[in-house]
Structures are given as structure tokens and as C-alpha cells.
Amino acid sequence: MSQMSITSQVIYDLVGLGFGPSNVAIAGALVDKWASPNSDAKSRSFQNVLFIEKHTSFQWHPGMLIPGAQMQISFLKDLATLRSPQSPITFLNYLHSQNRLASFINRGSTTPSRKEYADYLGWAARYVQDHGVKVNYGQEVIAIDEDADGLIGITSKDVTTNEIYTYKTRNLVISPGGSPRIPLTIAPLMNEPSVINDSTVLHSSAYLTSVDRLFQSLTRSSSSRRPFKIAVVGGGQSAAEVSLNLRERLSSIAFEGSVGHQVDMIIGRGSLKPSDDTPFSNEVFDPMTTDTWFGSSQHNRDRMITEYKPTNYSVVNPRTINAVRHVSPSLIYDQKVDDAIAARTLEDKTSGTSPARINIRANMRIVSLKYDDKNSTDSSSSPTTKSSSAFTLTLQNTHTPHTLHASAYDAIICATGYQRTGWIDMFKRSKRLGKHFGIGAEGAARVKLVPLDKRQRVDVDTLFDETAISSDVSSTASSSLYSVSGSDNSAASGVSGASTPLTSPSEEEGKSDVNLYISRRYRLLPVSTSSYEKTKTRDDDASEGVKMKARIYVQGVEEMTHGLSDTLLSVIGPRAGEVVEDLFAEE
């Protein structure tokens, strides 16, 4: 059966890939500009705006909307307040529209719950749609390219019907979000049918939407009522929240034996580290810090990444650490008290329920994984008893590397962060578009975002000729994306880098790197026509040498060029304002 293809006859002024918070903020800035009494003819004519979203409705981290989870930032760092406090899509306006403003004030806290913030984002998404912004949900973008007229063509596929849609736009904004990063030792299991059916291996991004199915698979045929043991890989905020929620769920399941249910947090460092959210450190997330970061040398940007990494990476909010260590009840300390009492009284618990244990497996690195599918269950067949755990992890203590530990688990949850690399593959697969940026189908070992300031914007061609790069330019316009350090298992041990290369060095080893230049206002800067002509081959169409007309922007992937706040919500409002202003700026 052939796929149906539908081509839009509209030439859009702007198409956005994705409709998460970043692009909702862009849409909000456009709606505000349209409504402004100072809007000019150009902004009033800039009305054909479309966003394409893979999910069938607006969603924001549905897998991590764990009951009781709190945001880590002030409600004032919303979609618009730092850009324009008068905007209709501020968090305060949301509260007022829901008749909860006074109640929120009475809470005495500036951080909303994650559940409430997700509802706010959905409210804002509906608002911009009601005010002229079109959103096509349920379509996954599969290709982008430039056409003969210099417009950007977008190809998407309906996630339900597989119908193919094509669109054309004068401007493009790419806000890809993050895709789950899975340790290489665990990744092969993500395609195992029995694992998929039972949700016994998950990324934390899918935790809440899959955990019920996981527990159904664990308890479906456990006639022996043996205790369960679940591994949580990672040492950051998500890992701690997932571990606490697993403990709560396991504590209500009866078991038989002297040892109850357990949750093992497998972390690469010696302990859970608290996030640095002190006022002075938080200044690194201020909008004006973006200017400092962008204008700094490569050396200084690397130094700032190292200095401020404890504000966001592989760290846990102190309140959550206290929950793991001291409260609900005293968890780890209370477990030690229980052990001492049991040993003194010779108590041997043989059945019933009791609080599940959380164990911190510190300084651990995952060496290998064995999966025994005979101990898994298939929901499509007759239930069978799980006599033992399905997964065996071989762990190596980094302090005693010659000693290996084999631990059996019933399920594995990977709270190992995200990667933001998929969007660059569309440039590499394109026939024309990628070549404007020096990216061809054959690719390079790495594609690296590099800041290019107007003060340094001599002919862009000279920046692609290493012999012509002056020492002043090369100190700022140089390799920029921070690689994850360590082995392939660095993510498995809960150690995340500040960002990942746009393409993996191991994928195309031995080839030269490509610098992908970006402006202060998040616009990708193409190689000029003369340099582009040098890359043409006999197979290229004659139209490919045309100077690029469209503008392309990226959001949420420029951490090393624009600062640590770029993948977070902290500057989402001001950034949207800057992108929209640049859209209307004259060349």
C-alpha cells in the first residue's frame, strides 16, 4: 500500500520544528508582536506561522510528572516575564486565569510543582493557537532541504496514518529538545520485544507513563512472592526522584523472606552531590550572562563549564537529598537502625510488607549486562512464574578496578540524561541545505557549534580556511561543543557532560571536523556563495549555487556557545524575543 503525500500550497513565513516550551515561547513573542500598537507593516504581514509536533497533543516531560515533584527555578523564569512582564502568557496571568493567584501567593514559595508548571505550558500553548498560531500535532519531521527558489522544504510523517506532508517556509526555527541517552551496555535491550512488552528497561523520561506496566509485569505471576530489586542508573535529580517513587510503590507489595524489596542507585561518583543554587551561582543563568559567554574565548567557556557544572549536571536538589537520607522515614539511616534491631533480637521477617530499601552503589561503572529472557514474562502468552531476576549487571568499583561485582535485578531505570544531536543528521541527509553550512552527506568526524560575533564577521569564507584565521578570531571562533568525558559507560555511571558533540567522534573517525557558525541571536550562519561554489560537484543542480535566502535558528542546543542556561527554562523568554527580533531585522 503506497503512502499518501499531501503538499501544502501555503508558503509559510515561519515553520518551527517541535512545539515544546522553546517554540511556545517563540509563538508567544510573535503573538505579542502582532498585538503591539507599535507593530509595523512587516510584522502584520508575517502571519503564516506553523509549528510541527510529533506528539498528538501538547506534552512536557509526562514521564517525570511524579507526584510532589517541584520545579527547580522561580516561576518568574517563565515563557515571557523576563522578555515582557506585560505579556498575556506569563505564569502570573495563568494563575489569575485559573483563580489561583492568591492561593499560590499563600504557599510561601516561588517554585511551583512540576505538575502545575506543565499545566501552565499547556495553557500557553492553547493561548497562542487561539491567537493565530497553527500547530500540526501528530507529525514527525523526517527531512528538511532547500528548494530551487531558496525556500526551506520540510517533510513530515503522520505518526498514526503514515501520510507524508510537505511544507515550504521562508524561515525555520529548530527546537529539537532532548532524546534519551542510554548507556551503550544497556541500549541493545531497548529493542528486545519482551523488555518492551514489560517495560523492564526504561529511561526516566518514560518513567511515569510506563511504571504501571512495569509493576504489572513484576507482580503478574510472582506466586513465590519473592522480593524485587530494581536498579536506577544515574546520580542526578531524576535518578533520586525515581528512586524515591519506586521505594514508595515497592513498600506496598507483600513479600516473603528476610530481605525485602530494594532499589539500587548506581552512581559513578562517591556520593550524591547537592546542586549549587546559591544566589551568586545562579547569576550564570541570567540573560545578560549570555553576552559574556558568547563573547568569551574557547578557553574561558571551557573554564566556565567546569566551574558551574555543579549548578545543573549530575547533582540533586538538597531537599531531595534530605528525602533520600533523612526523611520519609529516615530511609538510609533508618535502614541501619532496623538492621541493628533485627540482629539484636534475632528477628527474621518471613512475610508481609515493609519499607523498601534504597542502596547507594557509589563509584560504580557498568562493565557488562546479561539478560535472561527465560525469566521475563510475555503479556501475550500464558503467565509464567518469574523464579529469578532477568538482568545481571557486572559492576566495577572505580577505586578497586580489579574487583567485579555481579548484581541481579528485575528492572533497570536509566536516569542518564539526554542528547541533542538528531537535528544535525537532517542537514547531513539533505541534498542542498547542508552544503550551505559546509555539511555534506559524507559528513565529518564532528560538527561543532562555534560562536561568530558581528565584531569578528569578516568574510565567513576565511573562517573555513584555517590559514586565514587570525589569532584573535580563532580564540573565539573555535571548537565549541563539550564532549562527554570518559568511556562509553560515562552515562551509565551517572556522569553527564555539559553537552554532546553534534556528531560522535567514533562515527566517522579520521575525517576533518566542521565548524557550524552561529550568531548571538541563535541564527545558523551559512558559508557564502563563493565558498559554497567550491563544494559543488557535477551531480549538483545548477540552482544549488544560489546564495541562501532563508534564515534558520536553533534553540536548546547551544550550551557551549550561549551558556549553561540554553538547555534549561531560565532564558527561554528573552531568547524567544531575540529570535523574533532577528527574524524581522534587515540584512
Swiss-Prot record:
Q: What is its EC number?
A: 1.14.13.196
Cofactor(s) named in the record:
FAD
Q: Where is the composition biased (Polar residues)?
A: 491-505
Which positions does UniProt annotate for NADP(+) binding?
A: G235, G236, Q237, S238, N312, Y313, S314
Task: Please list which residues make up the signal peptide.
Answer: none
Name the pathway it acts in.
Siderophore biosynthesis; ferrichrome biosynthesis
As one GO molecular function, the record gives: ornithine N5-monooxygenase activity
- Record-listed substrate binding positions: K77, N282, E283, V284, F285, N312, S570
Broad EC category: oxidoreductase
Looking at the keywords, is NADP present?
A: yes
Could you tell me the keywords of this UniProt record?
FAD, Flavoprotein, Monooxygenase, NADP, Oxidoreductase
Cofactor remark from the record = Binds 1 FAD per subunit.
* Biological process per Gene Ontology, one example term: ferrichrome biosynthetic process
Ranges where the record places region Disordered: 488-511
Q: Is-annotated flag, keyword Amino-acid biosynthesis?
A: no
Annotated InterPro entries: FAD/NAD-bd_sf (IPR036188), Lys/Orn_oxygenase (IPR025700)
Recorded coiled-coil stretches: none
| Family in the record | Belongs to the lysine N(6)-hydroxylase/L-ornithine N(5)-oxygenase family.
Please describe what this protein does: L-ornithine N(5)-monooxygenase; part of the siderophore biosynthetic pathway. Omphalotus olearius produces ferrichrome A, but no other siderophore has been detected. Ferrichrome A consists of a hexapeptide ring made up of one glycine, two serine, and three N(5)-hydroxyornithine amino acid residues, the latter acylated by trans-(alpha-methyl)-glutaconic acid residues. The biosynthesis of ferrichrome A depends on the hydroxylation of ornithine to N(5)-hydroxyornithine, catalyzed by the monooxygenase omo1.
Q: How does it assemble?
A: Homotetramer.
Please name the PANTHER family in this protein's record: L-ORNITHINE N(5)-MONOOXYGENASE, MONOOXYGENASE
Q: What is this protein called?
A: L-ornithine N(5)-monooxygenase
This protein's species is: Omphalotus olearius (Jack o'lantern)
Q: Which gene encodes it?
A: omo1
